[in-house]
Structure formats: C-alpha cells, structure tokens
Amino acid sequence: IMPSLVGSEMCIRDSHNAAECETTGRSRDLALLPWGVMSEENYMRIIDLRGKKLTRAEMLEAMPRAEMGTNEATELVQPILDDVKARGAAALRDFAEKFDHIRPENLRVPAEAMKAALDELDPEVRAAIEESVRRCRAVSASQVPAPFHTDLAEGARVAERWIPVQRVGLYVPGGKAVYPSSVIMNVVPAQAAGVESLAIATPPSRNNSDGLPDKTILATCAILGVDEVYAVGGAQAIAMFAYGAKGSEPQDGEILCDPVDKITGPGNIFVATAKRMVSGIVGIDAVAGPTEIAIIADKGANPSWLAADLIGQAEHDELAGSVLITDSEELADKVQESLRYRVPRTEHAERVNTSLRGRQSGIILTDGIEQSIDAANAYAAEHLEVCLLYTSPSPRD
C-alpha cells in the first residue's frame, strides 16, 4: 500500500489499476489521471491505459503534462525586458551578474577568443561537429521552398517568392549544459535560407573567468562562420535582440547590438515567455516549452538504451518531459530497474531525478502498437523515438 497524491486528494494504491480515495471513500481509476501511479522505488510513474476505450478528450487528459506557471514567469520577465530596452548593455551586465553569477567584461565575444576556441577544440569533437554540419546542410538545402507562379489570364499572374529575413537573432541555451547542436540547428537553416546577418546569444560560462561562453559553443560558431556572438543569456538576450542594446563601456561601442527581424532558438520557461512577449514587435519561430521526448517501444527494445535516452532528455531541465510508451509491462519494469542503476551515477543526478519524477514524465502502458501510436499522437512530443522489434505493415506505416 502506497500513498499517492493525485490532484488534491490523497489516494491509497490497492490494486493494479485502482485507488481508494480517503477524501471520498470511493474508487477512482488512476489510469485516466495525469499523475498516474508512483512508487518510491521507481523513478517514473505508471499510466496504465490497458483495457480502456478512451475518447480523444480522455486520452489527452491521461497524458503527462507539466504545469508551466506562465503567469509567474510573465511577472518576472517584464521588468527584464523593460530594463534592457532602457539601459542596454548596462542592464545586460547587471543581469549576468545576478543570474549567471559573473560579470562579463566583453558582452560581444572578441574575434580572437573565437579563433582560440577553435584552435583548442579536440580534433575528434571538431570532426563530429563538422559531420553534423554536413548532414544538417544536406537536409536544410532540401527544405528551401521553390518559387512558383500561375498565369490566370493574359497579364494576370499570381506568384510566390521566398525572400530570406535580413537579420536573425539565434538563441543558444547554455545555463545547465553545452549544446553545440543548438548552434548548428539554428545557424545552418538560416544560412540555407540566405539570411545575411546572424547574431548568436548564449549565456556566459561560469567555468570561464573572463565571462565568455563555453569554448565548444564558440568553436562551433567559428566553424559555421558566425562572428557576431554575445555572452548574454535568458530573457535579457531576447530583449537585446528585440530592442537592440546601446553600449555602456568603451569596448561596447555606441551600439552593442542592433535589433533583429526574427528570433529563433530554444530556451527555458523565461526565454519562451520573453519570446512570446516580444512577438508583437519582432518575429519568432515558436513559443516552445521545456524539451520532451516520447519513445514507443515493444518487448524487443533494449531497456538500458531506453533508460539512457530518457535520462539524456531529463538532464536538460527539471521540467523536461521523458515518456516511454509500451505494450510490455516486462520492458517497463526493466527500464525502471535500469534507471535505478543509472540515475544516481549520472552527472546531473539531482536534475534528472526531479525531471523523471515530475508530472510531465511517465511510462504509459498500452494494449498494443495501435494504442501506443494513439498515445504518442496525443502527447505530440518534440522528439519521437520508435524502438520496435517487429510490427505488421498496417500500424500507420
């Protein structure tokens, strides 16, 4: 018997699928609730959909979701936007000191620092980055839409031409980990589209006494030929891109950063909120929440690999969502076992533990591949991984 908090009710787990609620004295099916069933020995809660014919609304309700707290984020972000708009670089340095615990001397990364980072980059890491760039360029080139026109009558033509945005601000997160992949996935599509002016903002690294960003990030920027890089993170970086920033120190110049036409890139809830709040004056790609992954797997999948992928997503952020969808209870148990071994040994164990145990993560048990697909579509994850040993041709190809 295990107490489990479901909404505002304290429930006692007494069977595989049911709970007796102390507050009402009646049985409620936990499988339909986002919180599911959790035990102290396991890292991830179980959401059991087996044997249930769910409506679309019930399926959506059963999915694990985080509570974002956007109202609180808005109240915190608005003063940051206002201060950067009013004071420019001076505000950026103050916020770096407050949030990143370092005060960068150079907000714009000097060219010599970029070159030094590239020269010092491990050859194997450089080779991996260059291969990632090559692959991303191949995909991005195929995504550029072709112009077209239709002649309706003599002198009457309807046409569409795709014209690149002139200047784009690219945000690369870096407060909790290093993401050269975010540099690549921001820069390469913009270059393929023909954007002429690219500026990157990424947080200063606490590991660098000079307040510059992580050297791998700088080296990746150098490989891609981007030389306008700022040691600025968080909502203040979004404000800098949206409004521009006047200089406050001699090394800044009169204008530290010109405003951009569009802002792209991932970030935490404060970055996402800032992008939403400036979207009326500058274009944005999307208001993305914390990163998430859904994995559809059957009994043939390797539980250790699945656990590693769930951990890899969870280490991004305490609110990151990691969801396993499977029709094999045996596989689910083995994944939990692997997590019990792996999580305490990972570098960011505390963050991973919080993420995996959060209401945004869980293991969804299904009757089969068809229901697994329905659950994956309802969850609609940012990243979808499919690990199936065998399936018939019919399940949605």
Q: Across the structure, where does each feature detected by a protein language model lie?
A:
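Conserved C-terminal structural/oligomerization subdomain of aldehyde/semialdehyde dehydrogenase
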Residues: R357-S392, R396
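Single conserved hydrophobic/aromatic residue that forms the stacking wall/gate
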Residues: I1-D14, Y390-D397
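Conserved NAD(P)+-binding/catalytic subdomain of aldehyde/semialdehyde dehydrogenases
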Residues: V226-G321
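Short, low-complexity intrinsically disordered segments enriched in A/P/G/S/L with frequent Arg
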Residues: E22, L30-L32
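N-terminal Rossmann-like NAD(P)+-binding subdomain of aldehyde/semialdehyde dehydrogenases
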Residues: S39-Q166
